[in-house]
């Protein structure tokens, strides 16, 4: 049986890590595409030369022609300018929309049967554009945001409580921006509610526990900006790559994972016609199901606010 083919569009920081992780996990053969000649070839050669040490047989190729992504099973798009200090994800929209247009046309022409995972910012707008231009079914075009935002939230909870990140379940919904919605009510450490654990840590002081959680939420919402501020020359790339690979693996290996995915809603959660981060089952058919659950009044208000921000951003492209 032929190995799966993974096409990575954009040979920057995230693209390089994606190529390495795809190879390490033996997800399939990798084509790394970039418009800069030599860049994807150099990165893939460098990763491939580690194959005897890292013990993988996946073939890695660098490319400057969209024809080389022909027949890809899955395409992960990172192309676009990264954020710099002081910029919001939304500031990138005009430049990255032009890039996304040509990328989407390339995917439509050469990988018409592929699943597409978009990482490029501003995410909610870029994934909308990609689906519109490719014309692919919405089950095959999705955005990576929630997996990363949820991972950040879970990490901050684990560090606060001094527990293993493996045991923390936390989910973030909504848009990939400052209005994202961490679902505090269902956050737990192996089934034990996080709020209860924080209260116990602070000797039953409910007000203190709320204050601590508010700080964790705020840090989660600004986590991307925190990394940008420290790096000064770009934005996060290790964690976004890992998050996109989790999604790709769920599809390629038909894992039926329930993950927060930026998906096109058709009435779910009261939203129609917009890409928003919601829980989805990811498997061999891409987004196989959007999983709805009831939000309480506070969560609903935050979610509505987040959706309004997404609508404003997406509508600004029209």
Swiss-Prot record:
Record-linked NCBIfam families: MalateDH_bact (TIGR01763), PRK06223.1 (NF004863)
Cited HAMAP family: Malate_dehydrog_3
Entry binding sites for NAD(+): 10-15, 34, 96, 119-121
Keyword NAD tagged: yes
Gene3D superfamilies to which the protein is assigned, alphabetical: Lactate dehydrogenase/glycoside hydrolase, family 4, C-terminal, NAD(P)-binding Rossmann-like Domain
Protein's UniProt name: Malate dehydrogenase
A family per Pfam: Ldh_1_C
Family per similarity comment: Belongs to the LDH/MDH superfamily. MDH type 3 family.
Residues reported to bind substrate: 83, 89, 121, 152
Reactions it catalyzes: (S)-malate + NAD(+) = oxaloacetate + NADH + H(+)
């Amino acid at each position: 049986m032929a190995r799966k083919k993974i096409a990575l569009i954009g040979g920057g920081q995230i693209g390089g890590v994606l190529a390495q992780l795809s190879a390490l996990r033996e997800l399939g053969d990798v084509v790394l595409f970039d418009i800069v000649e030599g860049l994807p070839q150099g990165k893939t050669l460098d990763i491939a030369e580690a194959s005897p040490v890292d013990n993988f047989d996946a073939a890695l190729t660098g490319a400057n022609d969209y024809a080389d992504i022909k027949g890809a099973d899955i395409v992960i798009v990172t192309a676009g300018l990264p954020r710099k200090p002081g910029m919001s994800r939304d500031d990138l929209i005009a430049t990255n929309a032009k890039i996304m247009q040509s990328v989407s046309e390339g995917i439509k022409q050469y990988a018409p049967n592929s699943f597409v995972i978009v990482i490029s910012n501003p995410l909610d707008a870029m994934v909308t554009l990609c689906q519109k231009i490719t014309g692919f079914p919405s089950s095959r075009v999705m955005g990576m945001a929630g997996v990363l935002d949820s991972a950040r939230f879970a990490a901050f909870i684990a560090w606060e409580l001094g527990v293993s990140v493996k045991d923390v379940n936390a989910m973030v919904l909504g848009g990939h921006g400052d209005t994202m919605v961490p679902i505090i009510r269902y956050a737990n450490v192996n089934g034990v509610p996080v709020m209860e654990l924080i209260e116990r840590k602070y000797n039953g002081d409910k007000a203190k526990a709320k204050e601590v959680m508010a700080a964790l939420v705020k840090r989660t919402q600004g986590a991307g900006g925190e990394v940008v501020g420290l790096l000064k020359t770009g934005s996060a790339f290790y964690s976004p790559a890992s998050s996109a690979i989790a999604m790709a693996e769920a599809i390629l290996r038909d894992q039926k994972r329930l993950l927060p995915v930026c998906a096109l809603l058709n009435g779910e959660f009261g939203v129609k016609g917009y890409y928003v981060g919601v829980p989805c089952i990811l498997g061999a058919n891409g987004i196989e199901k959007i999983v709805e659950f009831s939000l309480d009044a506070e969560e609903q208000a935050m979610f509505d606010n987040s959706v309004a921000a997404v609508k404003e951003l997406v509508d600004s492209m029209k």
